[in-house]
Amino acid sequence: MRCNIKRLFTLAIGVFAATLVIISFSKDNYEREWKQGPQSNEARAVGHQSPDLFPVGQNSLPHQPIPPSLGEKDLSDPFNFLFSSNKITLRKLYDLTKNVDFDQLRQNECKKNITLSKFWEKSEQRNVPEDDNWERFYSNIGSCSVYSDDQMIDNLLHDLNTSPIKHVHIMDGGTQVKFVFTFKNDKQAVFKPMRFGRDYESDPNHFYFSDFERHHAEIATFHLDRVLGFRRAIPTVGRVLNMTTELFEKAEKKLKKTFFFSPAKNFCFVSRCDYYCDTTHAICGLPDMKEGSVQVFLPDESAVPRKHNRSPYRRTYSKKNQVAEWQSSMNYCTDKVKTKRQYAHGRRLLDLVDIHILDYLIGNQDRHHFESFNVFNDLPSYAIHLDHGRAFGRSDFDDDDIILPLRQCCILRPSTFQTLMNFYSTPKSLTKALHESLSKDPAHPILAYKHYPAMERRLAKIMSHILECFESRGVAEVLVAEYNNPDVSDAEQNDEEQSEEHQDKKDDKKTV
């Protein structure tokens, strides 16, 4: 009996020891896997990702820094990177386009350019007030671009940055934190607060539709749109606010209730929205200073109506079905876009390519709709460049799907080609011109310098794709002032546009 007990005791000790060894071995393997972290397909595809960017599978939220304009100035060289244009690509582009009459083509891109005030004065004998910079901006909205007078825009940006705030309320309909500022002159603007510093990169495990919005992306995109000569983005400027006197004391009641002091004694708010409006994602000052972007309101739609149209290159906005038809078929533009009446004639398809060139340069995957002014009667409307808060999220990854409209449709506005070619071929690069423009913003520096080589890299890819189109389709077919598909009648174009807009109002963006 005593012998059996001793044997059982020895056996139990052995089993216990073996169990400890197994547990220790598993834990060691688990920790090793956790430290390594999963690598995304996107990161692997680039091949030059810095090992410090994503050391684990999921990023932790960084501390909220002070506004860069209030901190120490970054004296490093923003252009301390190697980049040169592909000489073979440049030579081929020059040779293929040397006989193109760009002056004539550019004249036909927008045949009648008239401002809103001139149009109403002529068509309705109606005078448009110009008592402040908001009204001057509205009255000078044109039939070819949102603005054309740079000095007028600079004056408006100054007012957006300095005008006393009268009232602050939560902007309805936004997925993330946005406020509406009403200034002393009763004019309004949209405010997006700074959540992260300039260096923060999007988590590769986040979908484009759940990524955090970045206020500085709105500022930088406005300047890039201006540098590229589009002038179809909405004027946006950086502004540093005192959260106590300029936000809390001016806030509506339901917003004011969401303010609190953090354990670090910083003043914070949560606000109300669909995503990230909770204490975990609170936005805090240091201790109560906060930077954000201020974007002028477009004129009220009751006075200046706009069309709201779904992009044919809209992503799925689904976790389950992540690949849209246009992402899997290179014939998509020919079969499904050029055959639609609203894209088969006029400037609309060229606008679509322009906006995707802009999106590709800034890394914006979140382009689901676009708007256009519906006020100039028979004059063709253009796509307004709106909603760039999720741009500039990744400097290490180029989403080449964004540029598929150019590659599939193979058409391009002559002025766009000339602008891109100029930046690609001359010493004053695209990012140098952008940096010069951004340095005028009161909240500069606006972008982390690591985005500059990313933009130059993407520009080089765009030029390569343009060359491919020239060689496969011919320059005359690619560079066009207007697109016209002879196989599609334009008789019912307006009816189809109205039908599309009506459907879009019923079918808002969803994530599944």
Curated annotation (Swiss-Prot):
Mn(2+) binds at residues 213, 387. Residues 27-512 are lumenal. The active site is at residue 366. Glycans are attached at residues 113, 242. It is found in: Golgi apparatus membrane; Secreted. Residues 500-512 have a biased composition (Basic and acidic residues). The chain crosses the membrane at residues 7-26. Disulfide bonds join 110-144, 268-284, 273-277, 333-409, 410-469. Residues 1-6 are cytoplasmic. GO terms for molecular function: ATP binding; manganese ion binding; protein serine kinase activity; protein serine/threonine kinase activity. It comes from the Eukaryota. CDD domains: FAM20_C (cd10314). Residues 486-512 are annotated as: Disordered. InterPro entries: FAM20, FAM20_C. Residues 489-499 have a biased composition (Acidic residues). It catalyses: L-seryl-[protein] + ATP = O-phospho-L-seryl-[protein] + ADP + H(+); L-threonyl-[protein] + ATP = O-phospho-L-threonyl-[protein] + ADP + H(+). Belongs to the FAM20 family. Golgi serine/threonine protein kinase that phosphorylates secretory pathway proteins within Ser-x-Glu/pSer motifs. PANTHER family: DENTIN MATRIX PROTEIN 4 PROTEIN FAM20 (PTHR12450), EXTRACELLULAR SERINE_THREONINE PROTEIN CG31145 (PTHR12450:SF22). This is Extracellular serine/threonine protein kinase CeFam20. It comes from Caenorhabditis elegans.
